[in-house]
Amino acid sequence: MANNGENGRHQEVGHKSLLQSDALYQYILDTSVYPREPEPMKELREITAKHPWNIMTTSADEGQFLSMLIKLINAKNTMEIGVFTGYSSLATAMALPDDGKILAMDINRENYEIGLPVIEKAGLAHKIEFKEGPALPVLDQMIEDGKYHGSYDFIFVDADKDNYLNYHKRLIDLVKVGGLIGYDNTLWNGSVVAPPDAPLRKYVRYYRDFVLELNKALAADPRIEICQLPVGDGITLCRRIS
């Protein structure tokens, strides 16, 4: 059993690992993730670790999972809402074929430009179309245009949790039948099962109800099949079936 010091340390990284043992999570990273992590992803991960908001990044094990997923479904046309420094975008770009594409949207280009030199050095910048600004107006325009319906193989959402349901209402039309939408942080630091009086960080408490609402809505949506996994901070995969 972990001692109090270990528990304390784990709480600081708990947003990205739901495992109760730091040692077990470190074992996964040291044995299966870091030895196989491509050099560009390692470089960007280490750069991002120095950012004051580094907790916003995709964890290395989740990056590995996304890369495997992209390859398994033979994705070619993808979208990402919420980019930060681009670690998950880089993982996706490395897994896509040379003519694969990512429409990457985030409200802060400055953060993306931290990772852009790494992406460019890896020869992958041509796969990523970055749009700065809120994603909802872009999605609305795409739906209005009509030509984007059912055009995406994979969509990854790691952005403002209070808009996840608004994203879902639109993305379900843009992903193809048989395609996947991945919603990140759906276990939200484990707070989805925390009692009402639990001592939670302010931002965790604020977004918890939105995450709970999303999870309930996805479970009841007949247009998708779902699988919720305790990878990183929880990811729910939604496969469009109608």
From Swiss-Prot:
Expressed in which tissues: Mostly expressed in petal limbs and tubes, and, at low levels, in stems, roots and leaves.
Natural source organism: Petunia hybrida (Petunia)
Entry superkingdom: Eukaryota
Keyword Electron transport included in the entry's annotation: no
Note accompanying the cofactor annotation: Binds 1 divalent metal cation per subunit.
Phylogenetic placement of the source organism: Eukaryota, Viridiplantae, Streptophyta, Embryophyta, Tracheophyta
MF-aspect GO terms: caffeoyl-CoA O-methyltransferase activity; metal ion binding
Keyword annotations of the record: Cytoplasm, Lignin biosynthesis, Metal-binding, Methyltransferase, S-adenosyl-L-methionine, Transferase
Main localization, broad class: cytoplasm
CDD domains: AdoMet_MTases
Binding site residues for S-adenosyl-L-methionine: T58, E80, G82, V83, S88, D106, A135, D160
Gene Ontology biological process terms, A to Z: circadian rhythm; green leaf volatile biosynthetic process; lignin biosynthetic process; methylation; phenylpropanoid metabolic process
PROSITE patterns: SAM_OMT_I
Similarity remark: Belongs to the class I-like SAM-binding methyltransferase superfamily. Cation-dependent O-methyltransferase family. CCoAMT subfamily.
Residues that coordinate or bind substrate: K16, D158, N189
The encoding gene: CCOAOMT2
This protein's name: Caffeoyl-CoA O-methyltransferase 2
Entry keyword Methyltransferase: yes
Residues where a divalent metal cation binds: D158, D184, N185
